[in-house]
Amino acid sequence: MSGRATGGRRPTVPAPLAPDDPDAWYAPDVREQDEIHPGVVVTVRQADGFRYEVREPVLSSRDRDALETVESHFDGANIERPRTREGAVERMEQGFDPKHRRVIDRLVECSPAGRRRVAYYALCSLACLGELTPYALDDRIDVADVTEDSVVVHTEDYAPATTALSDPEFIERFASERVGRHTVSFQGFEIP
């Protein structure tokens, strides 16, 4: 295939094929690629074993400055982190509490897309499982094993898959499963 026109024909690019198709021309080592959360893409590659890679939203320098402002403002704040992967998924779906959102809105001046990126990273670092958050969002991960120098995950279809994580904080929460959820009635409200 050539990128130059020959005769009266215009150059064409072949139609994309699924990553696991043996004739795929664009990423032969990619076995699976999915967006697990807005802007968060997971790729499973196969070379010498499986590799589980996470691509998170890209922060501009202005977004990074805004994130640092938010993180320094909330440094020492009592924001409870989820105790399980299920809790992390719920937290990411709900976002910050309204009072925290108002504070962040006052602190951050950026585009709506930049605001979403900053909110994602702030949620991960302040109110979720840090660098483990995107892994918690992928419901295809069945098991996570901590080795001497990395974290290895087992997905429904690919195992073991090495990750870029070495010794992440909150790994015990990531590995925990919610057994049940209980509430207590108080003044007409259900308190978890």
Please report, for each region that a protein language model flagged, where it lies by residue.
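N-terminal "pre-motor" subdomain/linker immediately upstream of P-loop NTPase catalytic cores
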Residues: 39, 57, 98-192
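Non-catalytic, solvent-exposed interaction/assembly segments
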Residues: 1-133
